């Protein structure tokens, strides 16, 4: 039923559905961290993605993989699984609440990367000043990671050295997700394979959990509530986003997503009970502004084209 509804959506309707992902994803970083504190980085992530996969199968049914080309399934699986592993583990491996929010901000370079990917690989027209948005986004990350001193290359490097694994995985997550979005938009994928991708992610995480031998999971009321909330935000977010990028306007979706870093930082700060300095918010605003500049560069070029 939902599959038929998805096929009948107009581009504007599909774009509107995709925009719901902004609300869901704004809560993800704080919830993933909270789950990892209750159930462990790997075990908690495995539980989240298993529950999210079940939720997606209930809502959308079993995906018909025969509708997708083998090459798309291979590359989309690679990008999606890589993205989710990097996202969950970068947050789970963060050393403290402040670092969790910083890692989340690095992850939110993906809107900028997605728009750049649309320009480079999907022939999306853009003005030359899209480069300014790209630079501004990275400058914002430098401010965020520079600490209370603001923009500082040496401070940023010193901060990254305290936990390079989390920061590198967060950057990889942004690149993987941009690649997945670009690929899905390029092939105009018919249908929704997100449930299949989530199943792959959960299987890999469970394999890592059992191979690590990290002990039993903590199934108390709080951990189950947070895990259910995180799984719901993940599952519903990706489900509606996939509808949006498959049938809607990816440039509009990527541009609207520049609100996520600010919303996410607010929610994460509240959930993790960690105050954030003025310099952090300045850097977060620069990341948002950078992605919006990239978006405007494509929108301006698109209007002139027609």
Briefly describe each language-model feature range.
Residues 24-31, 63-101, 143, 228, ...:
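Specific transmembrane alpha-helical segments of multi-pass solute transporters/efflux pumps
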Residues 35, 44, 90, 120-122, ...:
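Hydrophobic/aromatic residues within transmembrane alpha-helices
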């Amino acid at each position: 039923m939902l599959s038929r509804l998805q096929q009948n959506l107009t581009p504007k309707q599909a774009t509107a559905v995709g925009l719901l992902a902004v609300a869901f994803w704004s809560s993800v970083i704080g919830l993933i961290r909270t789950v990892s504190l209750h159930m462990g980085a790997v075990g908690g992530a495995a539980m989240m993605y298993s529950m999210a996969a079940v939720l997606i199968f209930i809502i959308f049914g079993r995906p018909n993989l025969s509708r997708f080309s083998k090459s798309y399934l291979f590359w989309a699986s690679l990008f999606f699984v890589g993205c989710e592993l990097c996202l969950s583990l970068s947050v789970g491996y963060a050393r403290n609440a402040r670092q969790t929010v910083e890692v989340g901000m690095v992850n939110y370079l993906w809107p900028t990367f997605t728009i750049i990917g649309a320009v480079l690989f999907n022939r999306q027209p853009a003005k030359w000043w899209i480069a300014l948005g790209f630079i501004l986004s990275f400058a914002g990350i430098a401010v965020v990671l520079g600490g209370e001193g603001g923009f500082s290359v040496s401070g940023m490097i010193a901060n990254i050295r305290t936990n390079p694994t989390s920061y590198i995985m967060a950057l990889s997550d942004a690149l993987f997700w941009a690649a997945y979005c670009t690929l899905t938009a390029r092939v105009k994928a018919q249908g929704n394979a997100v449930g299949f991708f989530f199943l792959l992610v959960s299987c890999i995480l469970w394999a890592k959990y059992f191979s690590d031998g990290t002990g039993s999971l903590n199934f108390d009321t709080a951990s189950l509530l947070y895990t259910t909330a995180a799984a719901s935000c993940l599952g519903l977010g990706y489900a509606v986003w996939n509808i949006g990028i498959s049938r809607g306007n990816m440039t509009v979706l990527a541009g609207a997503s520049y609100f996520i870093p600010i919303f996410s930082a607010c929610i994460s700060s509240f959930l993790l009970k960690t105050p954030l300095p003025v310099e952090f918010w300045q850097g977060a605003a620069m990341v948002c502004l950078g992605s919006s500049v990239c978006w405007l560069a494509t929108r301006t070029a698109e209007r002139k084209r027609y």
